[in-house]
Amino acid sequence: MGKRKSAAKPPPKKRMDKLDTVFSCPFCNHGSSVECRIDMKNLIGEASCRICQENFSTTVNALTEPIDIYSEWIDECERVNNVEDDDGA
């Protein structure tokens, strides 16, 4: 008589990688110079460049991550550039 087969252990869950909190500046193109901070008390997120002192602020919610603030900044820069291009043409 043999031993009863034991149930296989479930595979371990994969850990998600942390998202970046420092990014390259869209104005001076300096890598790792933009730092994002989230103030949950006042519901404000701020991205600022340490080199050229450019900054961007936006409203945040409980699910907002630093990459969201940076992405909004990039989107706003592109929107402003497109408006200026349309006015000049």
Swiss-Prot record:
GO MF entries: RNA polymerase II complex binding; zinc ion binding
Gene Ontology biological process terms, A to Z: transcription elongation by RNA polymerase II
Domain of life where this protein originates: Eukaryota
Where this protein primarily resides, as one coarse class? Answer: nucleus
- Residues bound to Zn(2+): C25, C28, C49, C52
Q: SUPFAM superfamilies from the xrefs?
A: Zinc beta-ribbon
Instruction: Tell me where it resides.
Output: Nucleus
Under the heading InterPro entries, the entry gives: Elf1, T_Elf1_sf
Question: What are the alphabetically sorted keywords of the record?
Answer: Metal-binding, Nucleus, Transcription, Transcription regulation, Zinc, Zinc-finger
Q: Name one GO cellular component term.
A: transcription elongation factor complex
What function does the entry list? Transcription elongation factor implicated in the maintenance of proper chromatin structure in actively transcribed regions.
Q: Which family does it belong to?
A: Belongs to the ELOF1 family.
Any idea what this protein is called?
Transcription elongation factor 1 homolog
In its UniProt entry, the species of origin is given as Oryza sativa subsp. japonica
